[in-house]
């Protein structure tokens, strides 16, 4: 950035102060680039908790979460666009036991990626408002919904891609509004009482290249296209929470870009 100098010469400032001259130099304004804040549970970084890093984050920052288990409820509610990026969804875990939700999102254009979100009393991810981006997450064993796009606080939408949404108490993915701004692609939604749900059956949700299996009801008021499959994803060890795909899984190479359906 070029240094700019502001020279202001003021003559005859007042009848009291005659011949007064003012010379000021303004320093260039530095526009700081978006940064990366690192969280680790072993005191090897500045931040021990995700919430502490988010408190220090600015618009456009990435909060990178090292492997470990984080027992907290995470809220991204300020007017900042944040990327919350886990190192590995198999080993980077937010355990929200006794918390309402593992992650709460408000405002536009936040991204959540590479995490396991589990054991919340209600929702794994609660989108209260705005357009959000959720990818490569395992969302499991939450008391109510895996992902809830609410309509109480405003308009909540999301692009949900390459997620594994399993064994939640009521619903895998619940979109209160049936709107084409919500896109669900390349996800496994399995072993929930209801799989993908909307409250406004207008046929607008985009639901493509997903695998649904073992839900009490796969679709509730949702109109999928024929790119979705209803087959056992063949998890490596479901009983122990290993949702990687075994050899021969119908999800291998079956995604929209010939990648795997699901997180792994």
Identify the function of each model-found stretch.
Residues 226-264:
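C-terminal accessory segments
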Residues 64, 75, 85, 95, ...:
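Extracellular beta-strand solenoid repeats
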Residues 65, 82-86, 110-113, 132-135, ...:
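All-beta strand scaffolds that present successive hydrophobic residues in beta-strands
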Residues 20-56, 67-69, 87-88, 233-239:
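Right-handed parallel beta-helix/beta-solenoid
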Residues 54, 73-77, 101-106, 123-129, ...:
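Glycine-rich beta-solenoid repeat tracts in large extracellular/virion proteins
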Residues 43, 67, 81-125, 230-238:
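Right-handed parallel beta-helix/beta-spiral solenoid domain characteristic of secreted/periplasmic
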Residues 69, 88, 116, 138-143, ...:
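A structural signal for beta-strand register positions
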Residues 109-174:
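Right-handed parallel beta-helix
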């Amino acid at each position: 950035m070029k240094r700019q100098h502001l020279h202001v010469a003021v003559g005859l400032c007042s009848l009291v102060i005659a011949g007064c001259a003012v010379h000021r130099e303004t320093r260039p304004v530095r526009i700081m680039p978006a940064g990366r804040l690192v969280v680790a549970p072993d005191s090897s970084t500045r931040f021990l908790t995700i919430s502490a890093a988010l408190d220090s984050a600015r618009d456009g920052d990435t909060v990178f979460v090292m492997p470990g288990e984080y027992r907290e409820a995470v809220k991204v509610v300020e007017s900042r666009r944040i990327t919350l990026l886990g190192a590995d969804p198999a080993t980077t875990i937010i355990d929200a036991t006794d918390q309402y939700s593992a992650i709460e999102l408000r405002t536009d254009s936040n991204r959540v990626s590479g995490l396991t979100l589990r054991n919340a009393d209600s929702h794994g991810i609660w989108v209260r408002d705005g357009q959000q981006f959720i990818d490569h997450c395992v969302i499991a064993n939450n008391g109510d919904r895996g992902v809830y796009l609410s309509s109480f606080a405003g308009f909540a939408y999301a692009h949900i891609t390459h997620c594994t949404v399993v064994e939640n108490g009521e619903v895998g993915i619940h979109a209160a509004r049936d709107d084409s701004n919500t896109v669900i692609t390349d996800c496994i939604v399995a072993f929930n009482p209801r799989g993908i749900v909307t409250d406004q059956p207008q046929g607008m949700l985009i639901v493509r290249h997903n695998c649904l299996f073992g839900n009490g009801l796969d679709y509730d008021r949702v109109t999928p296209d024929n790119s979705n499959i209803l087959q056992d994803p063949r998890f490596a060890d479901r009983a122990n929470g290993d949702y990687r795909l075994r050899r021969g899984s119908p999800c291998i190479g079956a995604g929209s870009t010939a990648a795997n359906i699901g997180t792994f």
